[in-house]
């Protein structure tokens, strides 16, 4: 243990005549950790009763199969028993006149015996479990040699208490720490210009144990050595840390010669520690200072320049004392009231989910062990994490974790935009919160407070700026599947997913995205070359768009598979079907930016298939949509009443008198490898009124029949899920447009009679209506996938590519793609945001002069 805070912590004097045991043969090699069941963790309880336990130590005690302890007070014993009833006191292995080394061997062995049985074992040693302790180091070394996982956790040592109670910093001007017997036995060097701490001064040269204490017969040998270096009048601080809450700390000043007084000598016990302050300070080495660039050549150090403040307590008369408020200190204090945090300062800005997760990982050993085995599982199953936070947890990078938790408002704003692009609920909430503050002159502050409550410590203005920046420089804004027209024909589906671009289901190599322009080249092994200019089309310019106009992300530009680049722009891509119903790619898997087909599009008879309780698919009744005025839907002999249609999704409820509930998504399928049956198809869920909604799709239908209903359902579910992503994107876009309008309105709200206010209010009202329309689409989509987790884009398949088909009847005369300016394409913006250089931690560089060389290898508790 770390200190002589109790009478059990005494050194075992070495027997210089002891038999020398040869080292084990070179063939002896430790086994890799963790090959065997069982785990050993040694923790420290600190010196002060209970209060100096670390949170990690307590958690390990609570979760252990077996606990063994040597502690300094009965209150700590009681605390350990309260945390784990399977606890054993190792103090019982001490005995009068029994060699302490025998005791330490036995202490280690009882822990190892339980470890070898496969148990999770925790050893608790008072103070720091690795400082002046033998059993802990012995047990860990043997456990590792035998192939078990074994580690030590630090504790609060007696020296830590001494530094705090006496008020010294070991780095100024350096500190030597010795065990008193070892100092004498090996004639250790003393440096009177540094602090000196001597442990176990009350049992010098003694190797056995005495319950009633020791006769310190060798004490004068220590005083002789100290007097040789420091002189008889140098101060010695007799220190004993307080243990129980009712205890008081002993800090008594004596001189070396006063310690020879028999009355004072009796006050020194086995738990006593000595502190000797510096006798004089070492002068600055001017040559080294010049080499380090800390002093110009030819300059001299002024008298008093090295005077420390706070002063060293009880230092000798040759140690100068500085002053609290000199010129430099007064100048620094004068600047305090005008201080503004610098741009590089990043306070804690993390989601509540991230903060809770990191706290749990730091204080719950079992949770951390589970995370270590599968970081992605925790990252993907924890709700409320932002995308960067999830990535940081998946990688386990200390640098990434720091960067996502200590961020700027601009960084957090980008995280919010990324989150609401994928979470329509968050986007809807933001829309409503913004609109509620339209006429409030303090609206920015109110919205900022709301954002902070959601885990995003940023402002709507920063979010607005982030949205504009991400439209130009981040593919996250455009994440979806796009149907394309190339040279008047249906082109390949282009998918943007998790920062990766796909042509059909082929990954695009070495693409670049900058200033809203996406480029790639066939010279890099791609099946084509392209220069595509992206834009998010909105109607926030104050001019209403024609009915059924496309609103959402699209791109225009150049796409070619061979030869030279086309002379004029030849490509249009949209998140959804084109007005005529033509298109390509995923066969109709669009987004909120298209209005969806009329019910008449889906008139036909569909052979249906349903999932059985055994998990297989079986054919069921025919679903028919009649070509009558009402477009009646029947299922076998049953008529469906009061159904609704939105964005190619039909739904009905048993509460309206239907035999079951259903939500189904329709699409026009073009043959692919995954789904070779052509024509209208649907996929969705059906369930009885008495049953909960199924967790996954369980119903599919198509014109004709299929030998693989499971494959058909899976392919259609993928298309439906990509449509969901498109709908979510539409909600996010409308939320951003509304936020921009509200910011303008808040700025004009100071004068509600002005034309600027009226125009801003009208724009905000219109943006709110547009947002509500997008949210209505999303509500239907939410119903379709009720009880399912939001789609994980890392797992979601890429829709199969379809062959080029002629859609020359598609009317695109109103689409102007001839003036696409791609001359300013910047492909120099190579993304190196994921280069992790933050893992270098230099905040805890230890420049103290602590001498730990040749610590007495037989010194023990």
Curated annotation (Swiss-Prot):
Q: Where is the composition biased (Gly residues)?
A: 579-593
Binding of S-adenosyl-L-methionine occurs at: 126, 128, 131, 158, 200, 241, 272-273
Enzyme category, top tier: transferase
The segment annotated Clasp domain runs over 280-408
Identify the SUPFAM superfamilies for this entry: Tetrapyrrole methylase
Question: What happens to this protein after translation, modification-wise?
Answer: AboMA automethylates at Val-805, Val-807, Thr-808, Val-810, Val-812, Thr-813, Val-815, Val-817, Thr-818, Val-820, Val-822, Thr-823, Val-825, Val-827 and Thr-828, Val-830, Val-832 and T-833 before being processed by a prolyloligopeptidase which likely forms a peptidyl ester upon removal of the follower propeptide, which then undergoes macrocyclization with the N-terminus of the modified core peptide.
**What stretches pass through the bilayer?**
none
What task does this protein carry out? Answer: Fusion protein of the methyltransferase aboM and a type III borosin core peptide; part of the gene cluster that mediates the biosynthesis of a type III borosin, a highly methylated cyclic peptide with potent biological activities. Type III borosins derive from the C-terminus of the fusion protein, and it is the same protein that methylates its own C-terminus using S-adenosyl methionine (SAM). The C-terminus is subsequently cleaved off and macrocyclized by a prolyloligopeptidase to give the final product.
Q: Which family does it belong to?
A: In the N-terminal section; belongs to the precorrin methyltransferase family.
Under what name is this protein listed? Methyltransferase/ribosomally synthesized type III borosin cyclic peptide precursor aboMAa
Q: What organism is listed for this UniProt entry?
A: Anomoporia bombycina
């Amino acid at each position: 243990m770390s200190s002589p805070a109790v009478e059990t912590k005494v050194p075992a004097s070495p027997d210089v005549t002891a038999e020398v045991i040869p080292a084990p043969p070179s063939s002896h090699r430790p086994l890799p950790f963790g090959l065997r069941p069982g785990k050993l963790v040694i923790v420290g309880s600190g010196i002060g009763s209970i209060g100096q336990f670390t949170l990690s130590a307590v958690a390990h005690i609570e979760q252990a199969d077996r606990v063994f302890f040597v502690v300094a007070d009965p209150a700590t014993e009681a605390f350990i028993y309260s945390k784990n009833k399977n606890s054993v006191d190792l103090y019982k292995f001490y005995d009068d006149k029994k060699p302490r080394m025998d005791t330490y061997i036995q202490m280690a062995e009882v822990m190892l015996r339980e470890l070898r049985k496969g148990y999770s074992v925790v050893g608790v040693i008072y103070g720091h479990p690795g400082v002046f302790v033998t059993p802990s180091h012995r047990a860990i070394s043997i456990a590792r040699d035998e192939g078990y996982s074994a580690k030590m956790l630090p504790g609060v040592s007696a020296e830590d208490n001494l530094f705090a109670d006496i008020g010294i910093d070991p780095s100024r001007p350096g500190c030597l720490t010795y065990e008193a017997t070892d100092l004498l036995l090996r004639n250790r060097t003393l440096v009177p210009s540094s602090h000196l701490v001597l442990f176990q001064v009350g049992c010098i040269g003694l190797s056995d144990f005495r319950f009633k204490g020791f006769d310190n017969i060798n004490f004068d040998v220590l005083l002789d050595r100290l007097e040789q270096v420091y002189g008889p009048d140098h101060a010695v601080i007799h220190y004993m840390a307080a243990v129980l809450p009712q205890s008081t700390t002993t800090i008594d000043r004596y001189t070396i010669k006063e310690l020879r007084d028999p009355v004072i000598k009796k006050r020194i016990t086995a738990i006593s520690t000595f502190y000797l302050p510096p006798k004089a300070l070492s002068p600055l080495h001017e040559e080294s200072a010049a080499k380090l660039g800390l002093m110009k050549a030819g300059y001299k150090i002024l008298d008093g320049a090295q005077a420390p403040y706070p002063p060293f307590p009880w230092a000798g008369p040759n140690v100068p004392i500085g002053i609290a408020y000199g010129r430099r200190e007064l100048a620094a204090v004068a600047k305090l009231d005008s201080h503004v945090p610098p741009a590089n300062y990043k306070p804690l800005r993390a989601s509540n989910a991230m903060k809770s997760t990191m706290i749990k990982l730091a204080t719950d050993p079992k949770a951390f062990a589970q995370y270590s085995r599968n970081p992605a599982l925790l990252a993907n199953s924890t709700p409320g994490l932002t995308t960067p936070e999830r990535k940081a947890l998946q990688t386990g990078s200390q640098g990434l974790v720091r960067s996502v938790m200590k961020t700027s408002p601009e960084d957090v704003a980008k995280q919010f935009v990324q989150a609401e692009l994928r979470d329509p609920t968050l986007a809807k909430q933001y829309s409503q919160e913004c609109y509620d503050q339209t006429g409030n002159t303090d609206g920015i502050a109110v919205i900022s407070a709301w954002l902070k409550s959601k885990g995003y410590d940023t402002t709507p203005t920063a979010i607005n700026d982030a949205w504009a920046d991400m439209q130009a420089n981040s593919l996250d804004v455009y994440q979806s599947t796009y149907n394309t027209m190339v040279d008047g024909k249906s082109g390949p589906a282009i998918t943007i997913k998790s920062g990766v671009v796909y042509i059909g289901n082929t990954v695009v190599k070495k693409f670049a995205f900058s200033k809203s322009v996406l480029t790639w080249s066939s010279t890099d092994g791609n099946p084509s070359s392209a220069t595509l200019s992206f834009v998010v089309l909105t109607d926030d310019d104050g001019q209403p768009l024609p009915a059924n106009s496309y609103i959402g992300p699209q791109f225009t530009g150049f796409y070619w598979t061979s030869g030279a680049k086309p002379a004029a722009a030849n490509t249009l891509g949209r998140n959804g079907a084109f007005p005529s119903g033509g298109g390509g790619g995923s066969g109709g898997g669009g987004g909120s930016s298209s209005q969806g087909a009329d019910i008449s599009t889906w008139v036909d008879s569909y052979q249906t298939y349903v999932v059985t309780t055994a998990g297989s698919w079986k054919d069921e009744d025919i679903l028919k949509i009649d070509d009558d005025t009402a477009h009646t839907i029947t299922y076998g002999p049953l008529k469906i009443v009061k159904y609704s249609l939105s964005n190619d999704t039909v739904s009905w409820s048993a509460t309206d008198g239907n035999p079951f509930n259903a939500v189904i998504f329709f699409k026009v399928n073009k043959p692919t490898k995954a789904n070779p049956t052509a024509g209208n198809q649907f996929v969705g869920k059906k369930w009885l009124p008495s049953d909960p909604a199924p967790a996954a799709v369980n119903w599919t239908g198509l014109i004709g029949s299929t030998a693989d209903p499971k494959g058909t359902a899976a392919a259609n579910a993928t298309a439906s899920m990509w449509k969901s992503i498109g709908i979510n994107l539409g909600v996010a876009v409308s939320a951003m447009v509304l936020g921009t309008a509200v910011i303008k309105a808040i700025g004009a709200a100071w004068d509600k009679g002005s034309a600027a206010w009226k125009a801003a209010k009208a724009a905000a009202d219109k943006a709110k209506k547009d947002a509500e329309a997008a949210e209505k689409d999303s509500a239907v989509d939410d119903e379709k996938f009720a009880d399912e987790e939001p789609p994980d884009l890392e797992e979601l398949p890429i829709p199969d590519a379809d062959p080029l088909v002629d859609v020359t009847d598609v009317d695109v005369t109103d689409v102007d793609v001839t003036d696409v300016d791609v001359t300013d394409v910047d492909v120099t913006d190579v993304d190196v945001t994921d280069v992790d250089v933050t893992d270098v931690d230099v905040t805890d560089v230890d420049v103290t002069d602590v001498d730990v060389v040749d610590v007495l290898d037989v010194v023990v508790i």
